[in-house]
Amino acid sequence: MITLKNGDGIKWPHGKRIAVLLTFDFDAEYLRYSVTGQRALGFSDISRGQYGPHEGLKRCLDMLARQNIKTTFFVPGIVAEKYADEVKQIAAAGHELAYHGYAHDARPGIPEAEEEANMAKAEAILEAISGKKVVGHRAPLDTLQTYGVKLMQKRGYLYSSTLKDCDWAYIHEGEHPVVELPTEPGFDDFSFFYFSYADAHTITCSYPAEYVYNMWKDAFDELANEGDKIMCLKLHPQLIGRSSRIRMLERLVLYMRQNGAWIAGCEEVARYVLAQNGKEADADAVAK
């Protein structure tokens, strides 16, 4: 249950007008397995997912380095196993690794014990790479289980970034508070750039990068004018990592910076939200 919100007048650091999170879901071909349920998923579709680790990730990391941005990558455990070198590059660049399922399993109704086992397995893999406790959670395909927040609190998570019920960060109360950093389908590159022959219900053509730039710029301007909001972009190296798209994203970053954005990673924003509400992360829980 949500019992505390911080949206009423939070002041972002250094007088910034809005908190912007450039988050990346590095799920490679496992995103496509989830979306299609492996229905007629041929190698062409699989290879589209593999574009992320093979090509797109490097462009994303290079752009982030040029702009001196440290952010959050949500990585399924199985991806960290298969593409260990690439995930090590993410961590070595100073970016946070956060939970995104073990096998990007998005089935509703996964038994709680099974999901907790998935969390433990994926956490161990990510922590072995980064040397840091996993404190962030994003449900695969946004399929947050009914017990999801309770399980995050039990396992000492600091924040979640799945729900879509408002434009500000808020706190799931409990013995161990968990900050929610909401996303929105309109801020997800999947909504504009995903392509698959395997499923008639998915997008079958991509939007021009300039169209997406203008949509995100307009949304940023309006949210920044309100002064207490967040804008959480959900990006995929296999999609945004195409050459013209990453150029578009970098142009957007420059515009946002010039117009009052605080661009930060999820953990940093979550800790700030807790502090602004007179709360602190449970150090013992987070250190587990």
What function would you assign to each model-found segment?
Residues M1-G136, L141-G186, V212-L233, L239-K288:
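Catalytic alpha-helical scaffold of carbohydrate-active enzymes acting on polysaccharides/glycoconjugates
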Residues P182-I203:
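Glycine-rich, positively charged active-site loop/lid region within alpha/beta enzyme cores that binds
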